[in-house]
Curated annotation (Swiss-Prot):
Coiled coil: none
Domain notes: Consists of three domains: the N-terminal catalytic domain, the editing domain and the C-terminal anticodon-binding domain.
Single GO MF descriptor: ATP binding
Gene: proS
Record note on quaternary structure: Homodimer.
Enzyme Commission designation: 6.1.1.15
Taxonomy, superkingdom: Bacteria
Source organism per UniProt: Xylella fastidiosa (strain 9a5c)
Pfam families linked: HGTP_anticodon (PF03129), tRNA-synt_2b (PF00587), tRNA_edit (PF04073)
Annotated TM spans: none
Primary localization: cytoplasm
Name of the protein: Proline--tRNA ligase
The protein's role, per its UniProt record: Catalyzes the attachment of proline to tRNA(Pro) in a two-step reaction: proline is first activated by ATP to form Pro-AMP and then transferred to the acceptor end of tRNA(Pro). As ProRS can inadvertently accommodate and process non-cognate amino acids such as alanine and cysteine, to avoid such errors it has two additional distinct editing activities against alanine. One activity is designated as 'pretransfer' editing and involves the tRNA(Pro)-independent hydrolysis of activated Ala-AMP.
Entry-linked PROSITE patterns: AA_TRNA_LIGASE_II
SUPFAM superfamilies documented for this protein: Class II aaRS ABD-related, Class II aaRS and biotin synthetases, YbaK/ProRS associated domain
């Protein structure tokens, strides 16, 4: 490949609304250009990277036994009504009409279409299991598309769907796909974590997300130093606390005139924040509760909502708080003589002794509070908090917190769609059995942006070798000055290509500084400079993108370095 024959247009100008590094660098490198809100054209350079990601995904899916297919992006309303998602999916579903006024949607996902295909094609248990996948354009009508291709309305996705006779076989394929995703992201050269996740509205018995670690990630992850345990922050758990501490203090009421925040109370009393207990008033279908957390912890809404009777909980308002406790936020507490309060204590709070709580009196807190003496044992003890950095993990390691960008997700869907769409096969006894499903998605175009978020510097992109547009750039200095220089570069290009090294020849005749800046910006892993001075010395200038070291190497050493 010669850059003189390739459309490469880099720029220093970027729109003011380009917030993420990946968005800015993709625009500067000329990988994408905005067509409309949330819609991007992939340039020849950008497409080279996208295709390399697709190739790795396709190779590993095929290796895992999945079979590629292609479903229409435009799908009829009737299918989505069968699954009851025509209305439930919300405004992200782009609905359109043809000239006959028949209604369709632009597919954001393909559970309905693939289930329709399978129910027509499969009739016997002998045809199961099957795992079908596609790499296809999707569309979700995001209300506020932003961050370039990271959250575009149109995107490229690999979505796979497996169909099984029973749950045991679904679990087997789910584990197969988890292992496949691990191989995919390893080959992509990305630092990632597979995390336990909440299944959310899509349902299912098991759900795991794959996140690329990056400071700009929207999701907060917790992972252990002791094993491969990792989870989304809403699903992460810490080790069970030890036995309850011994009580040593007597109950006292102290003045805290303006101290409403736990941090301020701890500072006033000159005690660790971990000794203060915060009381969060919540209303549920069964009434008023106080949820108790340690002062340095935060409430995990999802964990709390999963407790019996708390699915629809909400925070109590000031009127409700005053009616039940006769106080106001900032001074609430569970010690209420003669006024029993239903208490949900986090596991950490349940083993505390000599702790501090609000006195249910404005301007006062209670110190030296102990279970069983000053207040009854909690009605419910449960893990209702978010883990924090340094918590003891369930495997004995320490919890670390990082941010991640979700690029893959695997679900055990179960029979949700198959039941709704009557997708059955006959079992070995001739009885109709509803198939059970798994679904496995990878955001192909999002991976490109996530890779940049994780791998860049002030000069530009630092691609992992497996997805760089080219492995090597051969830069020719003054190609028109001396045909010998160009000839030497052509020979080197041919040698690298014959060794299956994806190489581009920069023969545009630009100033060296401009050429080098472009190669750094677009992230080519290896740069070789062919110059009159170097040829006279029998060497080529070499630099790896991830270092600042420039070396002058003879051809044999150079080729060995590139192929290593």
């Amino acid at each position: 490949m010669r850059l003189s024959e390739f459309h490469l247009h880099t720029t220093k100008e970027i729109p003011a609304d380009a917030e993420l590094v990946s968005h800015r660098l993709m625009l500067r490198a000329g990988m994408i250009r905005k067509l409309a809100s949330g819609l991007y054209t992939w340039s020849p350079l950008g497409l080279r990277v996208l295709r390399k990601v697709e190739a790795i995904v396709r190779d590993e899916m095929n290796r895992a036994g999945a079979v590629e297919m292609l479903l229409p992006t435009i799908q009829p309303r009737e299918l989505w009504e069968e699954s009851e998602r025509w209305e439930k999916f919300g405004n992200q579903l782009l609905k359109i009409k043809d000239r006959k006024q028949a209604e369709y949607c632009y597919s954001p996902t393909a559970e309905e279409a693939v289930t329709d295909y399978v129910r027509q094609e499969l009739t016997s248990y002998k045809q199961l299991p099957v795992n079908l996948y596609q790499i296809q354009t999707k569309f979700r009508d995001e209300i506020r598309p932003r961050f370039g291709v990271m959250r575009a309305r149109e995107f490229v996705m690999k979505d796979a769907y497996s169909f099984h006779l029973n749950d045991a076989d679904l679990v087997r394929e789910y584990e197969n796909m988890r292992a496949t995703y691990t191989r995919i992201f390893t080959r992509l050269g990305l630092e990632f974590r597979a995390v336990q996740a909440d299944s959310g509205a899509i349902g299912g018995d098991a759900s795991q997300e794959f996140h690329v670690i990056a400071d700009s990630g929207e999701d907060v992850l917790a992972f252990s130093t002791g094993s491969d345990y990792a989870a989304n922050i809403e699903a992460a758990i810490a080790a069970t606390p030890g036995p309850r501490l011994t009580a040593n203090e007597t109950l006292q009421k102290v003045s805290t005139p303006t101290q409403k925040r736990c941090e301020d109370v701890a500072a006033l009393l000159d005690i660790p924040l971990q000794r203060v207990v915060k009381s969060i008033a919540v209303m549920t279908d069964s009434g008023f509760f106080l949820a108790l957390l340690r002062g340095d912890h935060t409430l995990n809404d999802i964990k709390l909502s999963k407790l019996p009777g708390l699915a629809n909980f909400r925070l109590a308002n000031e009127v409700e708080i005053a009616r039940h406790l006769g106080s106001e936020p900032g001074f609430l507490g569970p010690v209420c003589p003669g006024m029993p309060i239903r208490i949900i204590a986090d596991c950490e709070v349940a083993v505390m002794a000599d702790f501090v709580v609000g006195a249910n009196e404005v301007g006062f807190h209670l110190v030296g509070v102990n279970w069983g003496r000053d207040l009854p044992e909690p009605e419910v003890v449960a893990d209702i908090r978010n883990v924090i950095e340094g918590d003891r993990a369930v495997d004995g390691g320490k919890i670390c917190i990082a941010r991640g960008i979700e690029v893959g997700h695997v679900f055990q869907l179960g029979r949700k769609y198959a039941e709704a769409m009557k997708a059955t096969v006959l079992d070995e006894y001739g009885k109709a059995v509803t198939m059970t499903m798994g679904c496995y998605g990878i955001g192909v175009s999002r991976i490109v942006a996530a890779a940049i978020e994780q791998n860049h510097d002030v000069a530009g992109i630092i691609w992992p070798a497996s997805i760089a547009p080219w492995q090597v750039a051969v830069c020719v200095i003054n190609p028109k000055k001396d045909p010998v220089i160009t000839a030497a570069a052509e020979v080197l290009l041919a040698e690298l290509q014959s060794a299956d090294v994806d190489t581009v020849l920069d023969d545009r005749g630009l100033r060296p500084g401009v050429m080098f800046a472009d190669m750094e910006l677009i992230g080519i892993p290896h740069r070789i400079v062919v110059s009159e001075r170097g040829l006279a010395a029998g060497t080529y200038e070499y630099r790896a993108r991830h270092t600042a070291m420039v070396e002058n190497l003879d051809k044999t050493t150079l080729l060995m370095r590139i192929k290593a």
